[in-house]
């Protein structure tokens, strides 16, 4: 890994942008379905819209990370914000076809933001403050991102009661537009440009060939690193498992709530989950300063996954509302620990010129696991209930995480012998 050039850290500049983006996202995600239905979409068209968004993200996830490594992460991230602005405009003023176009643009914005500014932030933090400080970098990133999303969701719920220009939910959308534009301008002026790998290597090959070559090199580098392979395999397992929690906790809560006000519980638990992720990130960041060996961090990573699986099993078997609320919060607390340690392991083992590419590959693996899980979960739920599904997913999580641990021990042993 070579020294980053021309790159002062300025963490507050990055974190302020992450905060604005997270707040903007929270303003709309809390009423996402309602926005689409108010624009004339039926429930079937809403499903199509979500599908278009998901397919776009999947298709562009890896190319966007490669593009950031080759042609500049700041540049590609700014393109992602322009796409997000266009999608918000489509949602605010469009009819059904324009809203569907907005879903495609939103998916492109999500994909192009992955492995770009976040990769640049982690890289510059590592070079200015050392590899052992990566846990703190991820802690701050998660804390700002999730807390701003949580606050944005609360504010979004309040704004949703007001219409702008007689159009429902435009207060949320216009506020999100202003914050996204502010983040774009903020980063444009305050974060230094990064030197693209294409300029460092003076590669004159056609862009598509450069992207294919970059992807091949990143995958080859991952195959040589036991830690990177654990991160990528673990991402597939994580996506497969967590999608079952994220998609089905709300209907499960509804069955347990009985006479409780479900809207209040949904809002309270959503906020509690985000707060728990922040707290888990803080705990993991502190642990990373105490445990400085790769093997020790792998153990924490695997222990957090074991704890997540045990919480899932308990939540599936203990069918009481107070217990579920506690276990749901605990699940996200441990997930925050896992996410921070996972990010630290990947960042400390990724080459600079492939950092964004590997982050996008990991994100793609996470989404791929989630897609497969959604297809299989639908079949399981046709015959069995949500608790049984969670037990099956927990079993897969335990097996997959155990495989990651065995794989690391065998590969790391071979590497050390060489």
Task: Place the predicted regions along the sequence by residue.
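Juxtamembrane intracellular "pre-TM" segments in multi-pass secondary transporters
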Residues: 1-9, 192-231
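Helix-loop junctions on the cytosolic side of multi-pass membrane transporters
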Residues: 169, 176, 181-204, 406-417
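A membrane-interface helix-boundary motif in multi-pass transporters
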Residues: 161-178, 260-267, 296, 379-397
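C-terminal transmembrane helical hairpin of 12-TM major facilitator-type secondary transporters
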Residues: 295-338
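Substrate-agnostic recognition of the 12-TM MFS/MFS-like secondary transporter fold
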Residues: 13-31, 49-66, 72, 80-81, ...
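Structural signature of the two symmetry-related core transmembrane helices
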Residues: 75-90, 177, 297-313, 394
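Short amphipathic helix-loop junctions that connect adjacent transmembrane helices
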Residues: 30-45, 247-264
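Helix-loop junctions at membrane interfaces in 12-TM secondary transporters
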Residues: 9-11, 92-103, 314-328
